[in-house]
Amino acid sequence: MSISTGEPRLAVEPAALRAWVEGRTIYVELHDGRIVGFPADRFRILAAATEEQLARVQVELNGYALRWEELDEDITVPGIVAGHFQLPPK
């Protein structure tokens, strides 16, 4: 049995602690311990990037975005976790 205080619960958006690339898959370790991965080919700009360019991913905005400076590409971590991709799977 749960007891409700009547106070709204604040939703916590997923945030990244770190990000890395293996081959053409980008992995993100989230603050809650989960690790999610997605193929670079699900985003237009990343699909055209080299593996070396993909490997230069940075975690930005307190963990709420991934940034590829050289590619001028930003992807939100909550969007990744929710499965919001630009392109369908191949």
List the predicted regions and their residue ranges.
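Motif-centric detector for short Cys/His coordination patterns
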Residues: M1-K90
